[in-house]
Swiss-Prot record:
BP terms from Gene Ontology: amino acid transport
Role according to the record: Part of the ABC transporter complex ArtPIQM involved in arginine transport. Probably responsible for the translocation of the substrate across the membrane.
Protein name in the entry: Arginine ABC transporter permease protein ArtQ
Phylogenetic placement of the source organism: Bacteria, Pseudomonadati, Pseudomonadota, Gammaproteobacteria, Pasteurellales
Major localization class: membrane
Alphabetic keyword roster: Amino-acid transport, Cell inner membrane, Cell membrane, Membrane, Transmembrane, Transmembrane helix, Transport
PROSITE patterns xrefs: ABC_TM1
GO MF entries: transmembrane transporter activity
Gene that produces this protein: artQ
Organism: Haemophilus influenzae (strain ATCC 51907 / DSM 11121 / KW20 / Rd)
Cross-referenced SUPFAM superfamilies: MetI-like
CDD domains (alphabetical): TM_PBP2
Compartment list: Cell inner membrane
């Protein structure tokens, strides 16, 4: 019995990891869009208000609004009732939360790039988009890595929130097993150890990335 429950926990851990990775990828994409739009003179202010709203709301509220509100919003716009899956809504909600904070990190990293980089690109006849993607962004990721790493660790722990909307993640599985066994300390403890293991492995990976991204700076010193 114990081994069966333990197998379910590890399966749920894979679901949690998949949820976190999907949210990270979508969140990075959204955070870049948010950072660019906030710098735009036409939509900058509304975008700033939207990001501030995401940052100001409790994260569980964002998850619930996305899960219950997405169906109502689509029905309002199209007149059709479409029920969205809990996993997809969880990914979207966590991505929005991640992007609200990561966009500020990216925005600061973009502003840290010397204007001479843009001017050099223009002098070489490169378009602004080419300069941004191929010259500016590689440097932006290096500057933003410490902040983004912290947000990734927060995101890993925030995945526990989606258990409330029915995603079969680690916390949801721990709840179900505890209901059957009445051993909360055992199963929540195992869940905590799995979260801790993933976090520690992530920290090692982040450290290696930081060393790789700064190898040229360390070589100059």
């Amino acid at each position: 019995m114990f081994s069966d429950f333990l197998s379910l926990m590890f399966t749920a851990a894979l679901m949690t990891l998949g949820l976190a990775v999907c949210s990270l990828l979508l969140g990075l994409f959204l955070s870049l869009i948010f950072a660019v739009l906030e710098a735009n003179r036409f939509v900058g202010k509304p975008m700033t208000v939207f990001v501030a709203l995401l940052r100001g709301l409790p994260e569980i509220i964002v998850v619930l609004l996305v899960y219950f509100g997405s169906t109502e919003l689509v029905e309002m716009l199209t007149g059709e009732y479409i029920e969205f899956g809990a996993f997809g809504c969880g990914v979207l909600a966590l991505s929005l939360i991640f992007a609200a904070y990561a966009s500020q990190t990216l925005r600061g990293a973009i502003q840290a790039i010397p204007k001479g980089q843009w001017e050099s690109g223009a002098a070489l006849g490169l378009s602004k988009s080419y300069t941004f993607i191929h010259i500016v962004m590689p440097q932006v990721w290096r500057h933003a890595l410490p902040g983004l790493s912290t947000q990734w660790l927060v995101l890993l722990k925030d995945t526990a929130l989606v258990s409330l909307i029915g995603v079969d993640d680690l916390m949801h599985q721990a709840d179900l097993i505890n209901t059957n066994t009445h051993q909360p300390f055992t199963w929540y403890g195992i869940a905590a150890l799995i979260y801790l293991a993933v976090t520690l492995i992530s920290q090692v990976g982040i450290r290696k990335l930081e060393l790789r991204f700064t190898r040229f700076e360390r070589g100059v010193k």
